[in-house]
Amino acid sequence: MATFKDTCYYYKRINKLNHAVLKLGVIDTWRPSPLTKYKGWCLDCCQHTDLTYCRGCTMYHDCQWCSQYGRCFLDSEPHLLRMRTFKNEVTKNDLMNLIDMYDTLFPINQRIVDKFMNSTRQHKCRNECITQWYNHLLMPITLQSLSVELDGDVYYVFGYYDSMSEINQTPFSFTNLIDMYDKLLLDNINFNRMSFLPVALQQEYALRYFSKSRFISEKRKCVSDLHFSANVIENLHNPSFKIQITRNCSDLSSDWNGVCKLVKDVSAYFNVLKTSHIEFYSISTRCRVFTQHKLKIASKHIKPNYVTSNHKTSATEVHNCKWCSINNSYTVWNDFRVKKIYDNIFNFLRALVKSNANVGHCSSQEKIYEYIKDVLDVCDDEKWKIAVTEIFNCLEPVELNNVKYALFNHEVNWDVINLLVQSVDKAPQILTLNDIVIIMKSIIYEWFDIRYMRNTPMTTFTVDKLRRLCTGVKTVDYDSGISDVE
């Protein structure tokens, strides 16, 4: 069993404060929740297990036991997970407050050790100091944390996480903040705690302490669509879909890193708990992570042969053509915005190809096809620009005064004409590479303007931000019939 979980189970009994704070799902009545194949550490009980998604942020960081309480590290209620979560600039004083909280909730002194030793020895054959019987006394105080960056804000969730080498499929990475504190001072705190333990347990305590306090921090991970609930991902192709989340809230102070100090004043802590309540939010899916997911799915179904075809219909409306017909049964095409982008991009590219190459039918095999598969995913800017550059080179542009030009004299639809006028101020006869980049980005930005999107969804906002946005009715997306430009 996880050390942190064991420790909470036993220390929960020592006083009223601990009974309120150390309440974990894994040590209460089990309520089943959907299991997934995502492996990682539950932020609530610190055990490595199969995770389910959090109802507060939709990321995978809860185990099936702890999910019954719906706690999130972004809550504004002073539960243990929130008090262990620090944000952005963490000072030495903040870490000192964290250590004080650990020492308050998980004290090790002669009275506590005797209490646990006596209760354990009441059972037969338990006169030896075997690790598994005293796991709750072997949790050292460390500055080990799991950290994640969410649109410029870095969150550190402190705890005692066993088996650091296990598979981690979450966006959280191990970070050691001992260098921001004082190694010798932390050593002294733990040696004092260790001195109350029987000699047989001291070595195990020391090994655990040094293994969790001297490790090298991992490189921070990038948050992707894989880290969010499958229920959300499955509904992304519905333009009117909103994510429903719940947050545990209370009247907390604005000092994010100072919440852990509440345990030093028991009456103040319980007064704050009296204001606890749940808030519900309906959140837009509009963000770069989810937009890229949709564009990547659409990219898998691209039929590049359309750019050399003579079809009179738009790219998504071609039927009974072996080379150009897309399968409209895929859910990605349920989002009319993706269809609109696909139609306009391919209408523009076909005009470019027809203006510069002598290709008469979509059955022909052209080199340009291999680069067209990446024209939708504008979120991967470097890869996208390489693809557009290669497409431009395939047009065999003419060079004048060190600038290459491609002809543009083939008909396009009215949507593309309007975007041409908006982006390059006219309906041109010739285009440079830069013009083509601007036009193609304008076609995509009309519906998904990633320049003004946050990277992760608003489900990763703090409660304060959600409240401010909710006041202005900005937590929901634009009306499904209006583009980003409008």
From Swiss-Prot:
A motif (IKBKB-like degron (ILD) motif) lies at residues 479-483. InterPro entries: Rotavirus_NSP1. Keywords: Host cytoplasm, Host cytoskeleton, Host-virus interaction, Inhibition of host innate immune response by virus, Inhibition of host IRF3 by virus, Inhibition of host IRF7 by virus, Inhibition of host NF-kappa-B by virus, Inhibition of host RLR pathway by virus, Interferon antiviral system evasion, Metal-binding, Phosphoprotein, RNA-binding, Viral immunoevasion. Its main location: host cell. The C-terminal region is phosphorylated by host CKII/CSNK2A1. Phosphorylation of the DSGXS motif is essential for host NF-kappa-B inhibition. One of its GO terms (cellular component) is host cytoskeleton. Residues 82-176 are annotated as: Important for cytoskeleton localization. It is found in: Host cytoplasm, Host cytoskeleton. Residues 42-79 are annotated as: Zinc-binding domain. Residues 1-81 are annotated as: RNA-binding. The keyword Isomerase does not apply. A motif (pLxIS motif) lies at residues 480-483. Residues 317-486 are annotated as: Interaction with host IRF3. Plays a role in the inhibition of host innate immunity by inducing the degradation of key host factors required to activate interferon production such as IRF3, IRF5 or IRF7. Associates with components of cullin RING ligases (CRLs) including CUL1 or CUL3, which are essential multisubunit ubiquitination complexes, to modulate their activities. Recognizes the host NF-kappa-B regulator BTRC through the presence of a DSGXS motif in the C-terminal substrate recognition domain. Interacts (via C-terminus) with host IRF3; this interaction leads to IRF3 degradation. Interacts with host IRF7; this interaction leads to IRF7 degradation. Interacts with host CUL1 and CUL3. Interacts with host BTRC. The integrity of the zinc-binding domain in NSP1 is important for degradation of host IRF3. Belongs to the rotavirus NSP1 family. This is Non-structural protein 1. It comes from Rotavirus A (strain RVA/Human/Venezuela/M37/1982/G1P2A[6]) (RV-A).
